[in-house]
Amino acid sequence: MENAELEVLEITRQMLEAMYTGDPEVHRKHSAADMSSYEWYIAPQRIDGLEFHLKLIEGGGNGTAGRLDILTPRVQLYGDTAIVNYTLLKTSFGAESQPPQFATMNETRVFVKIEGIWQMVHLHKSPTK
């Protein structure tokens, strides 16, 4: 992978972790204010604006995850535009006697380099089943 591909993939990883740690700063830095998203488990319509995601993160984000893995990532670069798609594997651990719980979803993120900083302008999530 090229340096720009690795950079966008690392930003993606940081954004995912921030959703589970309740840290909105990564999203403030790497999301355009007018970003859009489709998140099937939240709403059947498009969600517009970064503010929704910041409030979600500040309110506890996506709960807790014992582990997040980005499976089969692909980064496509077109000048100052990057498209990242992958399958997210979320592993949650319960009590010691309980087996781990797994959840997967497919995600696509579109980034544009604005004033030297990669910013997400669109996010699309879909179920894997």
Give short role names for the model-derived ranges.
Residues I83, T104-K129:
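Short beta-strand edge/turn micro-motifs at domain boundaries
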Residues Y86-F93:
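Generic short beta-strand segments
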